[in-house]
Amino acid sequence: MGNPRPRPLRLAEKLLQIRNGLGLSQTQMLERLGLGDTMHYGRISEYEQDKREPSLITLLAYARAASVHLEDIVDDDFELPRRLPGNVNYRGIKKSNRK
């Protein structure tokens, strides 16, 4: 089966930094992540207090919301940017169906 991976030591700190950097409440963060239908806003608090580790899907949603690489969030050797690129009303870029 292999060895369990080490848990990132700064994950909770970085998730809180993302939410604060985006200027969002916990409820707004949940909406921004697009996970409001699947989890309660209290889960955001649990992530930020290091009481629970988010799933990969949730971490990907954080990375998209903040417009940063997933590696920046989960790798303790990487720092998040001081200003998050996602602090504008980011809804993604619509892909063209042109060929």
What are these regions (language model features)?
Residues 2-5, 64, 74-99:
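Short, charged recognition helix plus adjacent turn
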Residues 34-53:
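Recognition helix of helix-turn-helix/homeodomain-like DNA-binding domains
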Residues 1-22:
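A short, Lys/Arg-rich alpha-helix, primarily the initiator
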Residues 29-33:
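Short alpha-helical "recognition helix" segments of helix-turn-helix
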Residues 27, 38, 42, 71:
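Key DNA-contact positions within bacterial/archaeal DNA-binding proteins
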Residues 10-13, 23-24, 39, 54-57:
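Residue-level signal for the short linker/turn that defines the boundary of a DNA-recognition helix
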Residues 51, 55-72:
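DNA major-groove recognition helix of helix-turn-helix/homeodomain DNA-binding modules
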Residues 14, 43-46, 72:
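Residue-level recognition of specific faces of alpha-helices
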